[in-house]
Curated annotation (Swiss-Prot):
This is Nisin biosynthesis protein NisC. One of its GO terms (biological process) is peptide modification. Could be implicated in the processing or the export process of the nisin lantibiotic. It comes from the Bacteria. InterPro entries: LanC, LANC-like, Nisin_biosynthesis_NisC. SMART domains: LANC_like. To B.subtilis SpaC and S.epidermidis EpiC.
Length: 418
């Protein structure tokens, strides 16, 4: 009975989202809104949601909406072009959202081929023009940078892009080397992503989060290794990254906490000097995201200590849930639940079952509390929350939406090239 209620509740919210997007695309037919084309806030996330929720009752309706939204995206791309190849704001995000359709229709295959060619152009241009002195998170991170693009590219089983994957892996690996006495990933104050972060880190910092920092780079290097794309330098970089977390874990007994950013004098003295002003237990920053680094790193390097610690990090974070005051994926409860689900799938652990069950039981309340002000986006809006809830009601996955979150269901399967 509860399952039927959950499905009805999800369906009601999806219909509301469709109505909002139908109206929005109608009004903006002759205008350009960059956000509409992004995985973060736009139609790619809606396409993923609809594809996952298709069943015998609504398959034709949802597929028609998917086709309409893809046509809308193509019309905008034809007129305005692409601004970036990134996962959350550009070509990689659009490509990921339609990748599951590549065998269904020749037009989708052609669109993917076009997007992939642009991604290759974008990556090569970015790396060729890169200046280490001006490095900023969008150069390398998951959201806007090459780590996110690589996560998408590793889904493509096409030798044509093997060199491109290795090019990104080498680029990311080199960023763990020293530059002027600091790791190359150290970001100057003026190169932070926002004015508030520049003010927070007047001396610059090494970002320790998953979304914009060191953990995200480590996760994608570990996954690339499992997929058969690695070398001595990338494995050394992965080890170096994890050792940084080992060295700078806050000295609070069995808390498994890290600061969001490390400052130059801390890195040089190899110890935490400044007190953390704020700690969040989320996908984007904090223990949950870092637990993925330890999990993937441990599996890739065959290190049981790292794998065991990954589970402890996540367990501690789930008990605290610091700074978690919403249901979004990025820095809310949905993101935590998806990480818990991954640990269950990869490690066959039951330690997080109670959190997942509680989330499922409260699904109706969760969707009711998720107001219109939260938006419909994938990363911070209700469509992402619905995707997380949907896995409790629909057992088959049709798309690759978890890949965008560095949640690699196939990590144990590998997929190395023969």
């Amino acid at each position: 009975m509860r399952i039927m209620m959950n499905k009805k509740n999800i369906k009601r919210n999806v219909e509301k989202i469709i109505a909002q997007w139908d109206e929005r695309t109608r009004k903006n037919k002759e205008n350009f809104d960059f956000g509409e084309l992004t995985l973060s806030t736009g139609l790619p996330g809606i396409i993923l949601m609809l594809a996952e929720l298709k069943n015998k009752d609504n398959s034709k309706i949802y597929q028609k909406k998917i086709d309409n939204y893809i046509e809308y995206i193509v019309s905008k791309l034809s007129t305005y072009g692409l601004l970036t190849g990134s996962l959350y704001s550009g070509a990689a995000g659009i490509a990921l959202s339609i990748l599951h359709l590549r065998e269904d229709d020749e037009k989708y295959k052609n669109l993917l081929d076009s997007l992939n060619r642009y991604i290759e152009y974008f990556v090569r241009e970015k790396i060729e023009g890169f200046n280490l002195e001006n490095i900023t998170p969008p150069d390398y991170d998951v959201i806007e940078g090459l780590s996110g693009i690589l996560s998408y590219l590793l889904l493509i089983n096409d030798e044509q892009y093997d060199d491109l994957k290795i090019l990104i892996i080498n680029f990311l690996s080199n960023l763990t080397k020293e530059n002027n006495g600091l790791i190359s990933l150290y970001i100057k104050s003026e190169n932070q992503m926002s004015q508030s972060e520049s003010e927070m880190y007047p001396l610059g910092c090494l970002n320790m989060g998953l979304a914009h920092g060191l953990a995200g780079v480590g996760c994608i290097l570990a996954y690339a290794h499992i997929k058969g794309y690695s070398n001595e330098a990338s494995l050394s970089a992965l080890q170096k990254i994890i050792f940084i977390y080992e060295k700078f874990e806050l000295e609070r007994k069995k808390q498994f906490l890290w600061k969001d950013g490390l400052v130059a004098d801390e890195l040089k003295k190899e110890k935490v000097i400044r007190e953390a002003s704020f700690i969040r237990d989320a996908w984007c920053y904090g223990g949950p995201g870092i637990s993925l680094l330890y999990l993937y790193g441990g599996l890739a390097l065959d290190n049981d200590y790292f794998v065991d610690k990954a589970e402890k990090i996540l367990e501690s974070a789930m008990q605290r849930k610091l700074g978690i005051d919403s249901y979004m994926i990025c820095h809310g409860y949905s993101g935590l639940i998806e990480i818990c689900s991954l640990f269950k799938r990869l490690l066959n652990t039951k330690k997080f079952d109670s959190y997942m069950e509680e989330f499922n039981v409260n699904s109706e309340q969760i969707l009711e509390e998720y107001g219109d002000e939260s938006g419909t986006g994938f990363l911070e809006g209700i469509s992402g929350c619905i995707l997380v809830l949907s896995k409790f009601e629909y057992s088959i996955n049709f798309t690759y939406w978890r890949q965008a979150l560095l949640l690699f269901d196939d990590f144990l399967k590998g997929g190395k090239r023969k």
